[in-house]
Each structure stands twice: as structure tokens, then as C-alpha cells.
């Protein structure tokens, strides 16, 4: 056996076992320590070249230089819109949700005031530094509301108005480090890509984490099993929400010890978390004494304070932090999102307004589409009401409106481009009630379009 070992050679350089310090065996192959060192040198050179190309990239140079304090912040304090101005802009884009819009306006205004305050403190002369200067901490925001109530739209509208980098992340794809799925640092990579890889600009942006309720702890007992997509993700997000220097892989994916990472300071990034939190109303009502377990008697019902009884749609207005803990969010996570805005469930009247009032309302969108075919589209007020009623029945919020109108307009959008003699079209309530079973009657050129509605 010893004679056989003496003839072992490196499969790469062909040196025998006696000529090298170490010979590592694999499945049918061998490699010596010298070849391993050579491979490491090759990998290091490749990493250096990659980093040099990244630093010289035109995308990085397109934005403002990082080392210039006068231009590193997108705007000065004097140009930041006041909360009333922010809410006015939100009113033009989002219908309803007055309380949530007011909370967002104040929170965003204070956030950028804090950024400007920090910039002024950093630019002070070293001789005049005040060790007792007040440090302003950021306040992340939690949006709670049913699906289709406008959580994502509010965040996107804010980013559009403030003209800062804005990224949307999905919490359902995140897992704890070491498991299949995305690391939490990939959220910052999306913000970097929106900033064209400008770190300084990304550090002043906004990140909206959607479906945050899906990372709630699966059980109230944290010791039952390891929850890598629930509590584990909450633990991983703690430092990022509070403010830390995060290492982000420039190509995404998992971090590798031999790959260079981009460092981002998250203390200046505003995080907005949103979720539907289905079932949270029941937790609030149970705390208020609305529900009881098992059979009840008249004497039991008399013990319930009638003043505390609330409708299920208004239960979230009485939300407390303990309710979120019972839902599955850990206290440390809740403590890093101090601002909480509860969005109202959309009513039929609100859905009608959403169809017609905003700048990008669905009715205006389809009117614009048909105007490109030289057709004037009109909606009867009763038809708008019928569409809103159908959307309210589907219980998916404003998202149901587009689905209904797309279904309503499908046949019309298919036939109208080929009928050049028709110049006007009106959507009626009967068309909606009859599930869009309308027929178009052709008329002589130059006449208006008439809708023949089947019974």
C-alpha cells in the first residue's frame, strides 16, 4: 500500500507526492497546495478587474459625485414641500384614506428634514462641533389595510412627488440567511439599481416592503420549530430598519466570501411596510370584548361593555401594539416602525370616485385609448355606479375595477378599430347588468353610435 501511495501525482502539475507539501485527494483526481495557491491568485485578479470595471462604469458616473457634500443630497430644506402640499398632491392621485395621507405627509416631511439636519451637522467646521447637538432619528412607517385599498399606490405617489429613488420589495420571497430564497440585502440592491448604482443617492431613497404581514411568526410559541421565512426574516430586518452598514452583493443572490460587496448606510433610508393583516380585526375585537369562546348566556352578554362594541370595518381604528404581537410580529420589529397608518376599507362611493376623479382614473384611461381610434367614449353615471357595486361585491378593493372594465370593454375594443363610421359610444347601466351582452348597430357614415341593449 505504501508503494502505491508513493506514485500519487497532482492531476494539474504532475508533481509527485514527495515534491509538494500537501496533496489533496478527490474522486479520482488529486491537487497539490501549489496549484491551489495559483488558483487563488487567478480568482483574486479576476475580482480586482471586476471591481475596477464597476468603479469606471458609466452608470455610476451619471449621478452626482459621492464625495461632494454640496450635491450629495437631492434637495435642500427650502425645496422640501410642506405636509399640506404633499397631501394635496396625494389627493389628486388617491381617493379617500385621509388619515393615512396625513400621517404619510408628516412622516415623509420630518424624514427629509432630518436628512438635511444631518447634512448641516456634517458640514460644520470641526472647531465648532457641538458634542451636545441633538440627533434626530428616523421613523419608519407601517401601512395596514385590506387588499386594494391603496397602500402601494400611496408609497409610489410619494416617491414620484419627491423625485427620489423608490424600490418595491416582496416580503414573501425573503428567507433567513443560509436558506433557499432571497437575503434581506437584496431589497437594498433593488434601490441601488433604481439609483443607477449611485450609493449616495440610494441612501436617501424610499423602500416599500409589501406583504409584510406574510412574515408574521407562524406560532405564538417561538421554540416549536425554526421559522426561516417568518420570525427569521423579522430578525434579519431589524438592523436594516434601524440603520446599519449593510453589505450588498452587486450581482444579487447570496453573499460570497470572495466577492466584493457594496456598503450602504440604511440609517437615511425611509422604509414603508405594508400588509393586509387578514384576521387582525378579530384580534382587536376579541380584546375589546366583542367575541367570546363557547356558549354564552344573557348574563355573560350583559357583562360586555356596549361602548366597546365596534363594527368589524372600524376595529383597526382601536389597534394597539399588543395586537400586532399576537398577530405574529415580534416586539423588536414593531419598535422599529413607530408610525402606523390604518387604511379604510373602500366603500361603494369611494370606488365610484376612483373610477372617475384621479388623474389616472380608469375611465379617463379608456377614453384616451378610444380617442386614438377617433371614438368618443362616455360612461353614464348609472353605469359607473353599477361597476362600483360589482367591484364592491368581489371584495378585492380597487383592483376589481380594472378587471370589470377590461371584461366590459373587451368586445368593444376588438370591434371598434374596424368600424370607422362610428364616432361615439356610451356605456350604460344595462350593459353592466346584462354582463356586457350589448350589440352594435351600424349606422350611415357621420351618424352617432347607438347601443342596442339586449334584454
Swiss-Prot record:
Where does the chain bind Zn(2+)? 10, 13, 32, 35
The similarity annotation says: Belongs to the ClpX chaperone family.
Give the protein's biological function: ATP-dependent specificity component of the Clp protease. It directs the protease to specific substrates. Can perform chaperone functions in the absence of ClpP.
Binding-site list for ATP: 146-153
| Superkingdom of this protein's organism | Bacteria
Task: Give the matching HAMAP family.
Answer: ClpX
Question: Sorted alphabetically, which Pfam families does this protein's record hold?
Answer: AAA_2 (PF07724), ClpB_D2-small (PF10431), zf-C4_ClpX (PF06689)
**Span of domain ClpX-type ZB:** 1-51
- Which GO MF term does the entry hold, naming one? ATP-dependent protein folding chaperone
Q: Which GO terms describe its cellular component?
A: HslUV protease complex
List the gene name.
Answer: clpX
**Record note on quaternary structure:** Component of the ClpX-ClpP complex. Forms a hexameric ring that, in the presence of ATP, binds to fourteen ClpP subunits assembled into a disk-like structure with a central cavity, resembling the structure of eukaryotic proteasomes.
Q: Which UniProt keywords apply?
A: ATP-binding, Chaperone, Metal-binding, Nucleotide-binding, Zinc
- Species name for this entry? Prochlorococcus marinus (strain MIT 9515)
* InterPro entries for this protein: AAA+_ATPase, ATP-dep_Clp_protease_ClpX, ATPase_AAA_core, Clp_ATPase_C, Clp_protease_ATP-bd_su_ClpX, ClpX_bact, P-loop_NTPase, Znf_CppX_C4
Protein name in the entry: ATP-dependent Clp protease ATP-binding subunit ClpX
In terms of SMART domains, this protein maps to: AAA, ClpB_D2-small, zf-C4_ClpX
The Gene Ontology biological process terms listed for this entry are: cell division; proteolysis involved in protein catabolic process
